[in-house]
Amino acid sequence: MKTLVLSIALALIAATGHAEDVTARSGGPSESAMLARNSEAAPDGMAFFRPVLSGVLYRSGFKGGDKGRTGMSGAQRTELCESGFSTAFYADFGKNTEFGRTSCGSGSLNYAAARSSRPSDVMKTVYDTIKDAGKGPVLVHCMWGVHSSGALSAMALVQFCGWSETRAKAYWNEARNGAPCGDSCDAWIDAKFDRFEVNPALKITDAERAAICPK
């Protein structure tokens, strides 16, 4: 009987832990989590699913890439929705993607296009999520999960956590897992940051920063 009770308890933890893991604003992700190859919270078929700001911002891509540029499947959107996400952005590559809202038992997920060279919409959405403790996290993904999603994530770390551009670019470089960038990876990320400026209107409190930012 004791074994049966333990098995049921573990099953309940597994069933509920997914949502709790992605929505908890628990003091900022560890470096190892930010650079992990993937996470147990990743929807099936997605890769490099990593926290950026605890309970607020995650990043990812697709296993094998998204060569058709069709974006997340209905099942992936529903899985994100059920786990507590409120918003997802496809950065740069979603030309054949049908964006829109997905409803689920726990709420809804809005799926929209984004550009790593025009980050203001993503930053504003992340800010609104930080300010609303009841709002589920944002996922920003790209084709592979290394370049464009990483650039927007690095910008968010500068905007909300006070990171220097140098530190943020170093994070982007390490998190791309050696993926090529054409002629120069430094030139690629520099060009993205040339289009980014910290927005003073999106300032957050020290307490909010302590709850979500990596140390």
Residue ranges and their predicted role:
Residues H18-V140, W144, A151-K215:
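Cys-dependent protein tyrosine phosphatase-like superfamily
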